[in-house]
Amino acid sequence: MNIKKTAVKSALAVAAAAAALTTNVSAKDFSGAELYTLEEVQYGKFEARMKMAAASGTVSSMFLYQNGSEIADGRPWVEVDIEVLGKNPGSFQSNIITGKAGAQKTSEKHHAVSPAADQAFHTYGLEWTPNYVRWTVDGQEVRKTEGGQVSNLTGTQGLRFNLWSSESAAWVGQFDESKLPLFQFINWVKVYKYTPGQGEGGSDFTLDWTDNFDTFDGSRWGKGDWTFDGNRVDLTDKNIYSRDGMLILALTRKGQESFNGQVPRDDEPAPQSSSSAPASSSSVPASSSSVPASSSSAFVPPSSSSATNAIHGMRTTPAVAKEHRNLVNAKGAKVNPNGHKRYRVNFEH
């Protein structure tokens, strides 16, 4: 999508522009899922025990992401990825994304996984410090990056997982919908604080919390309900399930969001869930609008059926705001002006 920014000088022009931009972005034929922590942190270690989904045309992932990176207003893009590309589940792609929206810098590398990521559970790890980013699989280092892009990973990031289908066949392969439904299984997640030299055995990390998904903890996790450019699916909370001690992300046809299968067995026992001390006063919730918390222009549905929508500066209903959610951000600026395949737009519903 590459829509030129237009200055609107009157209420009539605003209404006309809103009508012209109307697009049903929830009319996609497929539904995916995204899970994210409500808290963002600066530095840490993140581990997840997972059996990934894989079919040509899909992406099954674990990543760190600074909410709002996708907004083209000059702020930095901050992201660190583990992505299993469906065309080759025998490996995963590691990546750091920095720069700015429309001018991102990436550093993709590919790493073998055996057994294949969709055939067995593996423990995937990310370590993020001021000096390096390190990727591990089953406790073994597969990549470590120091300096360069790492110095640009400023601010905070939240932990996320998603399952979706890219429209870029060159990247992920031709989409094969006959393979649906697909499922990504997460047995447990551990998050560690960055505590240089003070962790177990003198390490730089101290365990903060563990989630074994015996139940879904809504005080810790949010369920995505959005889409983004280049995504064949709508990400929906209907495709996230907690069953038999496993968190499940699904990729399905629209209207068939469900999980009626058997949860696969992981031979490694899950740890007990634990909670960290409350940190909400200083954390940056990833479930907020794509603009910083200090902005007053984010759209928040009130108790009544209509509101002044900061997206278009007009009285409208939440449903209308939802229609326009991936065309403009909460500041009223056009998103993704350079048609980049990866950006996210949060919206209320």
UniProtKB/Swiss-Prot annotation:
Q: Where are the sequence repeats?
A: 271-277, 278-284, 285-291, 292-298, 301-307
Q: Does the keyword Endoplasmic reticulum apply?
A: no
Q: Which residues form the signal peptide?
A: 1-27
Catalysed reactions, as listed in the record: Hydrolysis of (1->4)-beta-D-glucosidic linkages in beta-D-glucans containing (1->3)- and (1->4)-bonds
Output compositional bias ranges, type Low complexity. Answer: 270-307
Q: What class of enzyme is it?
A: hydrolase
* Active site, UniProt feature: 79 (nucleophile), 83 (proton donor)
EC assignment: 3.2.1.73
Q: Which Pfam family, giving just one, matches this sequence? A: Glyco_hydro_16
- Region of interest called 5 X 7 AA tandem repeats of P-X-S-S-S-S-X, as start-end residue ranges on this chain: 271-307
Could you list this entry's UniProt keywords, alphabetically sorted.
Answer: Glycosidase, Hydrolase, Repeat, Signal
Q: Which domain of life is it from?
A: Bacteria
> Could you tell me which residue ranges the GH16 domain spans?
28-197
State the similarity comment: Belongs to the glycosyl hydrolase 16 family.
- What protein name does the entry list? Beta-glucanase
